[in-house]
UniProtKB/Swiss-Prot annotation:
GO terms for molecular function: protein-glutamine glutaminase activity. Gene3D superfamilies: 3.30.1330.200. InterPro entries: CheD-like_sf, Chemorcpt_Glu_NH3ase_CheD, Cytotoxic_necrot_fac-like_cat. This is Probable chemoreceptor glutamine deamidase CheD. Probably deamidates glutamine residues to glutamate on methyl-accepting chemotaxis receptors (MCPs), playing an important role in chemotaxis. The keyword Hydrolase applies. Pfam families: CheD. One of its GO terms (biological process) is chemotaxis. Its EC number is 3.5.1.44. It comes from Methanococcus maripaludis (strain C5 / ATCC BAA-1333). It catalyses: L-glutaminyl-[protein] + H2O = L-glutamyl-[protein] + NH4(+).
Amino acid sequence: MVLKVKMGDIGVGKSPESIETLLGSCVAIILYDKGKKIGGLAHVMLPKSRMQKEKNPGKYVDTAIPELITKIVKMGARKDRLTVKLAGGAAMFGNNSNNIDVGKKNIEASKIEIKKIGLRVSSEDLGGDTGRTITLSLKDGSVMVRKGSELKTI
């Protein structure tokens, strides 16, 4: 079964499922426990929550990460065994000085928050100017990244 995660949402599951999302400037924060074959993905849209944190914790980097950890730990994952992968954060609107590079800000915030909770990023596919589709296999924790006709695993 493939669980599709929408913008601002969080999806969790266990082997043999997979989790998929489509990214532009948003970032996918992927956590996986190899021992239990449990993982999840947060499709974050913005770096920081200001108001209404409880309403949609998956929308913001600073609220999505703790929520994702809580959800997968409830399924049986162990925080001390989690691997972290990041994908997305494209500059979808060019590098015009009038535009705020939301993708870059999402990337920076994701790395800061991951470090704050004592985890580190094991692999990533970030930036650029092209959207991507990612699929997390909960069988082995691999993440397939598709950008146009380009396909790679992180």
